[in-house]
A protein has these predicted regions:
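Cytosolic covalent-transfer regions centered on His/Cys nucleophiles
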Residues: 1-149
Length: 149
């Protein structure tokens, strides 16, 4: 699934006022391309308010997501590097420097993508390289190289 990602699915060096703004900005492309509805963005934020920063996975990465029925039209993903990094309220893994917005249409169509991402992102050095990317082209090249390792 990572091979289907294009430069349009990547935003580099985004400034966000806070974690809510970071989620909104990371989801903006998916909203503009009608992959998700605005209700999905609201649901992602509302879930963090209710449950806490469970979306912060480690290595300063947040995986923003909500339930498919909250407004997903098509399986999609968007990567956003934050500059500067933004606290999400996770004592252990703040601040977040990479937000991955995942829109899944059902319970399992995204599992291959999650598996591929986990293999890449569990290495903190990989995350650092991705976050330091100068542009979407470099980010995509690095992501594809890391996937092959």
């Amino acid at each position: 699934m990572l091979e289907k990602i294009s430069e349009e699915n990547i935003s580099i060096g985004v400034h966000a006022a806070d974690w809510e703004d970071a989620i909104r900005k990371s989801a903006q492309y998916l909203l503009e391309t009608k992959k998700i509805e605005n209700s999905y963005i609201d649901a992602m934020i509302e879930t963090v308010h209710k449950i806490g920063p469970y979306i912060v996975l480690g290595n300063h990465v947040a995986l923003a997501h909500a339930r498919p029925e909250c407004g997903v039209n098509q399986l999609s993903v968007h990567f956003t590097t934050l500059n500067p990094p933004v606290p999400f309220g996770s004592e252990k893994f703040d601040p977040v420097s990479l937000v991955i917005t995942l829109a899944a249409v059902d319970a399992d169509s995204h599992l291959e993508l999650i598996s591929e991402l986990a293999n890449v992102l569990m290495d903190e050095e990989n995350v650092d390289k991705l976050v330091e990317s100068k542009n979407a082209s470099e980010f995509l090249r690095l992501l594809n190289e890391m996937k092959e390792e």
